């Protein structure tokens, strides 16, 4: 599987998807992206942006899709049977996991491997564009 990424650009506060990611320069620690503008359904113009690694957040695709066929990325917030959960990478287990939002504030939050329940998930946002979903309702 070829890794697929999306990038949150802190400057400009915009999500860049892999189709618009032109280059990842590991030596200079920067990426080059494009924003394509369409007119009448056809590409009309584009802007090119360069971001330092310090100004972006990489999010890798899990390779899985939610119940509506939407690709699930690290950092996504999902609805799972009426509870919100956030998707994270667990380095020790080399696996994507989900943690319920209402457990994030606990000292020891429970987590589960993503592959066990992803087919019940519905992606409802992500930690950058919809951070309010990470707030615990009391």
Segments and roles (model prediction):
Residues 1-138:
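Secondary-structure transition motif
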């Amino acid at each position: 599987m070829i890794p697929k990424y999306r990038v949150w650009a802190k400057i400009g506060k915009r999500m860049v998807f892999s189709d618009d990611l032109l280059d990842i320069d590991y030596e200079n620690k920067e990426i080059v992206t494009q924003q394509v503008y369409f007119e009448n359904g056809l590409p009309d113009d584009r802007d090119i942006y360069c971001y330092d690694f310090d100004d972006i957040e990489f999010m890798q695709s899990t390779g899985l899709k939610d119940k509506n066929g939407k690709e699930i990325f690290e950092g996504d917030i999902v609805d799972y049977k009426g509870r919100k959960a956030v998707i994270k990478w667990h380095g020790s287990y080399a696996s994507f996991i989900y943690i319920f939002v209402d457990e994030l504030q606990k000292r020891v939050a429970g987590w589960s491997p993503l592959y066990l329940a992803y087919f019940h998930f519905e992606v409802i946002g992500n930690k950058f564009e919809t951070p309010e979903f990470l707030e615990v309702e009391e």
